[in-house]
Amino acid sequence: MIPLCVAEGVGVLPWSPLARGLLAGNRGTVRAETDDIARRFYTHESDPAVLARVGDIARRRGVSNAQVALAWLMQQPGVVAPLIGATKPHHIDDACAAVDLKLDAEEMKRLTDAYQPHPVTGHHQ
């Protein structure tokens, strides 16, 4: 779908760009431990590798995991604005900081190579 959107000049607005907080690294929160949707949707075998690489880049850059994940997403062709679900002020701070964070080609490749597309899930199947 994304290549078609790019070819037709249609902007992409990714929903839940941090995978319900998974990419922000918040696995130890009450929400993460009780979120049945996240457990159902974000259990692909490639997910741990993606999380590890996001965390590694964030540590090396001195930024949050959320900033790295959002920066990667915003550097993808066709993406015009991720739809974040901010519930705390620092979520907005991370999203704003991600706009100015430019990942280099090696970092982009490390993240892209680890990711495997997930099957379509949810009520639109």
Language-model segment annotations:
Residues A19, L23, L83, V120:
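Short glycine/serine/threonine-biased micro-segments
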Residues A86:
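Short, basic-rich loop-to-helix N-cap that marks the start of a DNA-contacting helix
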Residues A7, R31-R60, Q75-V79, P89-Q125:
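Terminal-tail/helix-coil boundary detector
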Residues G11, V80-P82:
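Beta-sheet entry/capping signal
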Residues V68:
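Glycine/threonine-rich phosphate-binding loop and adjacent beta-strand/alpha-helix elements that clamp
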Residues N26, R40, V63-N65, P82:
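Short, flexible segments with low predicted structural confidence
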Residues M1-A32, S64:
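Aromatic-lined glycan-binding groove of carbohydrate-active enzymes
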Residues A71-W72:
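Hydrophobic, secondary-structure "cap" segments at the distal end of domains
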